[in-house]
């Protein structure tokens, strides 16, 4: 194999630039030509492909985001769009494609390979940690530590004001960010999609702890585990606590 291309697809994740750097330098050291694809599958379809060298990836290992940029490409679900992408690669003599992304990106990569004979390597890059066959995906550890930082700061304010903090975190249908950050941050309650819970029972428990003198609690909610405003209302009404919602998103 003499030529490969690299793209980042879907949501960006911490560590993508370090991964790009490693791929580019390793491939060049192995005698390959390396091409970058701007804006994921969208760029692949629109032929936004350029040659990279070792200088292209200087001073990026410490940067967040992705220097290749990323974008959603809904048209990639159509076979004719995927064929156009494959034709763009073949026209440049590119024999292999490295896809850094999550489950949606991997689905697109599989179709691209199965239908058009493109050699594809997938590198799991998503904060959600929702891909099999790897303990941790690129970006997950940073996401957990970012949430932990927020929880630690919120607890100080919630304790000062005798409030309950409901912290909603990312993760889609996977509760790993909520679980890991909640445990590390000492949250009293962690709500994840994988485990059913009774919010009324939780609210009653908060009420009892309040009567015993505990005036502050942290609830960490994974985004796929329920509606934060509905949970806030139930907890407020049953426990009588002042509940504040904090949604952690693109930070």
Model-predicted regions and their roles:
Residues 1-45:
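N-terminal phosphate-binding or glycine-rich loops at protein starts, especially the Walker A/P-loop
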Residues 3-10, 66-71, 95-99, 165-168, ...:
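Short glycine-rich or small-residue beta-strand-to-loop segments that form or flank ligand, phosphate
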Residues 4-6, 60-72, 125-135, 160-162, ...:
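Gly-rich Lys/Arg/Thr-decorated short loops/hinges at beta-loop-alpha junctions or inter-strand turns
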Residues 9-12, 37-42, 72-73, 102-104, ...:
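Short, ordered loop/turn segments at secondary-structure junctions
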Residues 21-30, 50-56, 111-121, 138-142, ...:
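A glycine- and small-aliphatic-rich helix-loop capping segment at beta-alpha/alpha-beta transitions
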Residues 44-99, 105, 138-145, 149:
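Glycine-rich oxoanion-binding loops at beta->alpha junctions
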Residues 99-101, 107, 111, 116, ...:
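Accessory alpha-helical/coil subdomains and C-terminal extensions
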């Amino acid at each position: 194999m003499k030529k490969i291309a690299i793209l980042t697809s879907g949501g960006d994740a911490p560590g993508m630039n370090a991964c790009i750097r490693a791929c580019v330098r390793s491939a060049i050291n192995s005698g390959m030509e390396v091409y970058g694809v701007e804006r994921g599958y969208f760029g692949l379809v629109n032929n936004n492909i350029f040659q990279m060298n070792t200088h292209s990836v200087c001073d990026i290992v410490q940067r967040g985001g992705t220097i290749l940029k990323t974008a959603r490409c809904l048209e990639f679900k159509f076979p004719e769009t995927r064929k156009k992408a494959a034709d763009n690669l073949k026209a440049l003599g590119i024999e292999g494609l490295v896809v850094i992304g999550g489950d949606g990106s991997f689905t697109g990569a599989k179709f691209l390979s199965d239908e058009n004979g493109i050699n594809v390597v997938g590198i799991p890059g998503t904060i959600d940690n929702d891909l099999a066959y790897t303990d941790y995906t690129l970006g997950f550890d940073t996401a957990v530590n970012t949430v932990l930082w927020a929880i630690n700061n919120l607890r100080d304010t919630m304790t000062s004001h005798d409030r309950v903090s409901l912290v909603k975190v990312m993760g889609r249908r996977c509760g790993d960010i909520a679980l890991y950050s909640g445990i590390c941050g000492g949250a009293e309650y962690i709500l994840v999609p994988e485990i059913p819970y009774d919010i009324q029972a939780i609210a009653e428990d908060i009420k009892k702890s309040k009567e015993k003198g505990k005036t502050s609690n942290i609830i960490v909610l994974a985004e796929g585990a329920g509606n934060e405003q509905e949970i806030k209302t139930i907890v407020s009404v049953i426990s009588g606590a002042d509940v504040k919602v904090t949604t952690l998103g693109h930070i």
